[in-house]
Structure formats: structure tokens, C-alpha cells
């Protein structure tokens, strides 16, 4: 018997420690597997710590086994991220997963996943309609689900958890999902006394502020971040033709021309704001930037271990 947690640990923090302790307490007979993304994340971020460091800290705080989520899944949209993660869970004959959920209503997520599975033709028609209107893929997916179910999934952990359960249902995997209540106030503006979101902690780290109240991890500047690589990204986009940029994975729908149009923006934030639109979310743009930076044409053949950034060398716990 085993249970999986699908994680990025960017960075590992007290909320993750609580999740591991909760899982050990409530599933005492199960080995805990962490399906862990590597040096890059689903939102197109460069991980503050590398895979080896994240693995060590997870094992220290209660995980039994670490399985790497391949780059080709770890740096994709939520539905592809979930597809890869749940496929690995099934391949290792792990019969349970547990994830944080704002609603903590796993039965409703199963209900919606079954409804989606039984009405895929209608769902896909609504999805295509919304995409033609210029919606981003996440917003188009939310629109299609609401059209067939009358429900919106609002919170980010519920959205990702729903994608996990969709994969379980669609593939008839012998896996049962469980949820751990996650507060909606677990955010930038309202960190709890010793627990805060990874987004908030990344902000603190990037501002060279201590996160010791919230995490056992320690970071030394300069830290790994996409903004720090923006000058290199500018150089590549300026020197590469639009035709050759379009050969890179995730560079489609003319986004290469949009990048070239705004490549003279003076910094990462201004570039992101210039390119962001109803169709292109920040995460979609950042994932594309990562693929351009490392010239990745086929993510299934990309060995991220060959990328050794100096900013990973002194990060630890």
C-alpha cells in the first residue's frame, strides 16, 4: 500500500511538512511517494533549489521515496502536468494520492470528472468555441466545464486536483484521491503565523528576505529566477529568426512574432506585461521563455541535468 504526493517544492515549506505529517498520521500503513518536478516548474519558473536538494529535504521530513516527474510533463499546462504525474503513480502501482484542496470536497471533484468523461464531445465543442474567442486554455477549459456542469472550479489547488481526478477517471486507474484542507487565505496578503504560500515565499526570497519563519530552507543570492536570465533571452530572440524560433516546443500561434515585437522591453516584468493577453497567460509565456532559453525542440529528449546553474550551488537547508 502506498500514497503519492505530487509536488514542486518551490520552495519546500512548513505547509509541506504539515502535509507529510498529516499523511503519515492518517495513512500509517502506506509508504509515501513524492512525484517531484525537477529544476523547472509548471508555471515556467526556474526552481529555487535543484531536484537533488528538494529530494533530500523531502526525505528528511518524512517521504519514503522520490520519483522525478520528467521535464516534458513538469513544464507543461496543468492537464499535461497531471497526465504525466498520474501516469507515473499508476506505473508504480501506488493506489492513493493526496493533494491540498481549498474546497476539500473530493466527492464533488469526482462528480465533475465523471460528468466531463461522459460528455467529452460537448465539452470539447465548448472548449474550441472559447479558444476561437481568444480565451487562454485555462479560461476556455473553465468555460467548457461550467457549460456542461453549471459549476466553476475557482481555486488553484482544486483546479489541479480536478485534473488529477480527470486522469484517474478517464483511464480507469485503480487510484483513489484524497484531499487535505487548504485555506483560501493561504496567500500573499494573508500568511498564517508559520505557513505561507510558495508564491509568497518566492517573493520574499527574491527580495533577499528571510523565510525562516515559514521554511527550513535557506537561500543565498543570487537565486535562480527567470528575470535574471532575461538578458540572455533577449539575445536569443534578437539573433534567431521567427522561423527558427517557431521550431522550438511551445512556440506556436505566432507567439514568436509577439516576442520579437516586445523584445526591447527593458526588463522581464515589462516584457511579461507587454506580451500577456487574454490568450497568453503569464505561465504560458514563462514556459515558452524557458524553452527558448534552452532551445528545446523536443522536451522528451531534453536532459535537464545537463543544465547546471551557479545559483543552485549554495541553496539548501
Curated annotation (Swiss-Prot):
It is found in: Cytoplasm. The gene is tmcAL. Coiled coil: none annotated. This is tRNA(Met) cytidine acetate ligase. Keywords: ATP-binding, Cytoplasm, Ligase, Nucleotide-binding, RNA-binding, tRNA processing, tRNA-binding. Its EC number is 6.3.4.-. Catalyzes the formation of N(4)-acetylcytidine (ac(4)C) at the wobble position of elongator tRNA(Met), using acetate and ATP as substrates. First activates an acetate ion to form acetyladenylate (Ac-AMP) and then transfers the acetyl group to tRNA to form ac(4)C34. Belongs to the TmcAL family.
Amino acid at each position: 500500500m502506498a500514497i503519492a504526493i505530487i509536488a514542486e517544492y518551490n520552495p519546500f515549506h512548513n505547509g509541506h511538512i504539515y502535509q507529510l505529517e498529516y499523511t503519515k498520521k492518517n495513512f500509517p500503513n502506506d509508504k509515501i511517494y513524492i512525484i517531484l518536478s525537477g529544476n523547472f516548474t509548471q508555471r515556467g519558473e526556474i526552481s529555487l533549489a535543484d531536484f537533488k536538494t528538494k529530494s533530500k529535504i523531502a526525505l528528511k521530513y518524512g517521504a519514503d521515496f522520490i520519483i522525478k516527474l520528467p521535464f516534458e510533463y513538469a513544464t507543461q499546462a496543468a492537464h499535461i502536468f497531471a497526465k504525466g504525474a498520474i501516469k507515473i503513480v499508476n506505473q508504480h502501482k501506488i493506489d492513493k494520492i493526496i493533494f491540498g484542496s481549498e474546497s476539500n470536497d473530493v466527492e464533488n471533484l469526482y462528480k465533475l470528472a465523471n460528468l466531463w468523461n461522459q460528455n467529452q464531445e460537448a465539452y470539447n465543442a465548448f472548449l474550441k468555441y472559447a479558444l476561437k474567442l481568444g480565451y487562454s486554455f485555462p479560461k476556455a477549459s473553465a468555460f467548457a466545464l461550467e457549460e456542461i456542469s453549471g459549476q466553476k472550479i475557482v481555486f488553484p489547488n482544486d483546479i489541479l486536483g480536478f485534473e488529477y481526478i480527470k486522469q484517474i477517471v478517464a483511464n480507469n486507474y485503480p487510484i483513489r484521491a484524497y484531499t487535505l484542507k487548504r485555506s483560501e487565505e493561504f496567500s500573499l496578503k494573508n500568511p498564517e503565523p508559520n505557513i505561507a504560500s510558495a508564491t509568497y515565499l518566492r517573493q520574499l526570497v527574491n527580495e533577499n528576505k528571510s523565510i525562516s519563519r515559514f521554511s527550513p530552507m535557506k537561500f543565498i543570492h543570487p537565486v535562480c529566477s527567470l528575470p535574471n536570465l532575461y538578458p540572455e533571452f533577449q539575445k536569443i530572440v534578437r539573433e534567431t529568426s521567427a522561423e527558427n524560433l517557431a521550431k522550438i516546443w511551445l512556440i506556436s500561434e505566432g507567439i514568436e512574432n509577439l516576442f520579437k515585437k516586445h523584445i526591447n522591453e527593458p526588463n522581464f516584468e515589462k516584457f511579461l506585461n507587454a506580451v500577456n493577453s487574454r490568450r497568453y497567460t503569464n505561465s504560458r509565456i514563462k514556459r515558452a521563455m524557458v524553452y527558448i532559453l534552452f532551445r528545446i525542440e523536443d522536451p522528451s529528449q531534453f536532459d535537464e541535468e545537463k543544465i547546471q546553474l551557479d545559483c543552485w550551488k549554495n541553496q539548501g537547508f
